[in-house]
Amino acid sequence: CIERSVLIPFSDDITFFYGNTGVGKTTLFNLINYVLGQELIRTQTIYEEVKGVCIDAFVCGQRLQIERKISSNMITVKDERDVFSFLAKGDSTSRVTFSDYLYKLAGLKPIEMLRGKSSKAVRVSFANFMWFAYLRQDELDNTLFYLGEQNGNFKKYASNYVMRVFLNESKEIEKEIVQEINKI
């Protein structure tokens, strides 16, 4: 068991992790996803050796320390002046979320999409975009966006929202147009 912090430097632009099977690439990505608000995939190594995850990053020119302890539902963010806490999972309508904070740093309003055939707006979280930051080679086909998922799989809907953001569609588009698109 490692009784110290492990520092893994990332590039300022983009970082690629490559290597043989079983060296920890997926585990590293899962830890990054966890600190950003997703569920942790608990392997024996994670269970035995990881107490928390902390990312030091520059986001929109501001240095942030983003931290989440194992078995915690709270994300703690420290900037140059303040400390903020966000629920990793929960009702995103009741308070400011971590995604809202990131959007604010970028000078954006939280992104919302109309859900399916209803006129209810749904927020697109930062985590929805993270699914496309790690691409498994065996998933680089028509299942990439989970559009074939049955029974209303949440990834199908969230992937649809992310694609619509890429295509510059948001709730500002008239509801009638979106409803017509959903009929197709």
Each PLM stretch: what is its role?
Residues 1-66:
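Extreme N-terminal "head/tail" segments of very large remodeling/mechanoenzyme assemblies
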Residues 67-71:
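Short beta-strand micro-motifs enriched in acidic
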Residues 72-175:
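Extended, charged alpha-helical "arm/stalk" segments used for dimerization and assembly
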